[in-house]
């Protein structure tokens, strides 16, 4: 038996080595990863930075002029923001009050008289009782009274 086990181990090792050789000979080609070319973008950013630096040196000399321009820009933005708020308030005035649902149920535009529908349902199925009926509650109370009488002995 030990001879058979040794032979099996030898065969297994041979299979593994042949399998490894086949893997080595047929290596999958490594996937090429393409690097994005940011060189053009970097050049544009560098140009903008140099312009900004040049603009800063000029703006330091003309600081008062730039401050007044920024104040004007702020005023324009405030005016625009104020106009947007007024438009929203105007939209609220255009809402028709007849479209507002006063009851608690949504009916997707249909006007439903719930009292009439309840009466129609009662006419169609008068034998069906609901949990809200008085008779339903009385049956439960009677059962409880009977149980209590048994325990009072």
Swiss-Prot record:
**Keyword list, A-Z:** Acetylation, Chaperone, Nucleus, Phosphoprotein
Phosphoserine modification sites?
A: 68, 70
Protein name (database record): Histone H2A.Z-specific chaperone CHZ1
Q: Listed GO cellular component terms?
A: nucleus
- Mention any additional remark: Present with 623 molecules/cell in log phase SD medium.
- Any one Pfam family match given in the protein's UniProt record, by short name: CHZ
Q: Where is the composition biased (Acidic residues)?
A: 84-94, 139-153
Q: Where is this region: Important for H2A.Z-H2B binding?
A: 87-108
Regions of biased composition (Basic and acidic residues) lie at 1-29, 110-138
Q: How does it assemble?
A: Forms a heterotrimer with H2A.Z-H2B, stabilizing the association of the histone dimer. Also, with a lower affinity, forms a heterotrimer with H2A-H2B.
Q: Where in the cell is it found?
A: Nucleus
Its family remark reads: Belongs to the CHZ1 family.
Set out the biological process GO terms recorded for this chain's protein.
chromatin remodeling
Bias class Polar residues marks the residues at: 56-65
The role this protein plays is: Forms a chaperone-bound H2A.Z-H2B complex that acts as a source for SWR1 complex-dependent H2A to H2A.Z histone replacement in chromatin.
Q: Region (Disordered): which ranges?
A: 1-153
> Where N-acetylserine occurs, residue numbers?
2
Q: Which GO terms describe its molecular function?
A: histone binding
